[in-house]
Structures are given as C-alpha cells and as structure tokens.
Amino acid sequence: MSQAKNIIQMVVMLTVVLLLSGCDTLLKGDGVVDVKGQYFDLANRSVAVVVSMSDFTEFNHPNAKEMITNEMTRRIMSNVPGVTATSPKEILAWQKENAYWATRPPSALIKQLKVERLILVEIGEYRTHEPGDRHVLRGVISASVHVVEAEAADPDNFGASFTKNVMYPEPGESKIGRVGDSEELIEVRTQIRFCESAAGVFYDHQIVR
C-alpha cells in the first residue's frame, strides 16, 4: 500500500512539474536551445521502451523505473510522427513476469515484444545527493540508450547507441525556485531532465535553461 501511495505522490509531483514547465521543458532559465535529433527511424513504426537498472538502484528508488518508462514513452509518442508504442504498464508487467529478461539477447527481446524498434535504456549511475553527503541534494542519472532494429541482419548489433549523463541542478545553475526543494522533487526534476535528453535523440526539439 505504501509503495502505491509513493507512486501516486510521484505521479502528482511529476504532473505539477510538467504543468509549471509548459509540459516539454522543465526549467525556466537563461534561454532556449535548439537540439537536433540523431535517430529518426522511429517514425511510423511500433516501439517499446524498456528500462533496466541495478537491483540496488531499484531497491532504493522503487518508483524510478516506472516513472522513466512512462515519461520516455510519453515524449516519443508526443513528438515522433506515426509512432505507436507498447504501453508502459504492459512493459512493466512483462518485466515482472520475465525476471531474467535482461540476460536474453536483444534479438530475442524484440521478437517477444513484437515491435519494430526496441529502445533499451540501461541506467548506470542514479542518485539524488552528493556521494557521502545526503544533505547536499543533486540528482544524477547516467545511462546508455540503445536502439534494436527488428529487420536488421543481426538485431543483436544495435542500430544506434547514445550515452546520456544529466545532473540537476548543474554546478552554477540558477538556484531560483530551489529553496526548500525535497529529495523527492530533486529526483523528479532529474528524471524529467534525463528523459528530455534521452528521448530527445529521436526528434528535433528545444530546451529551456
């Protein structure tokens, strides 16, 4: 029950952040930056977003996988023309039912999920405060984002791979609006910043800092 309550609270917090930020950008800052996409072959294709992280990270941040799966899928659906995506709820249920899915080759995963493109988000570092000091809040997410292509001669060789490292707040970033920020809010803002960057490789977009 407490985990369900935590998820609801995180969803509400995420919704508030999105509404306050104009939905597709998180922070009001010094200017608008145009960012070019790097991989455009999701258009008019079926897609699944699958997020993996260590057991340690998942234990300490039990809502993280769901939140990132939801937000990555939402952004791709909102910005890539003609794309269809397997629902995050279905993906998360599939992961629970197939506990050792991460040990299987990408070619087997994309075949089982019955999609044309599989986006694998492999999260490495994930934290909400400075190492060794829980009183200094700073979110960090580092991950590899891989694209598996169903029709490739060898789907086990990724069609594209990207490395994403995000931090919130960044050193020197304006502190306006951060007085009294909680660890939960720092986590949500870091998740949004990560998804903005990770999903953004699939379409042209703007970010506000």
Located regions from the model:
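Bacterial N-terminal signal peptides that target proteins for export
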Residues: 1-12
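Bacterial Sec-type N-terminal signal peptides, specifically the leucine/valine-rich hydrophobic h-region
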Residues: 17-20
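C-terminal/domain-edge helix-coil "capping" segments
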Residues: 23-45, 109-112, 137-140, 146-209
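N-terminal segment of the mature soluble domain
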Residues: 46, 51, 55-124, 150-153, ...
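Short, glycine/charged-enriched secondary-structure capping and boundary segments
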Residues: 63-64, 134-137
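Extracytoplasmic/secreted cell-surface and envelope-processing proteins
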Residues: 128-133
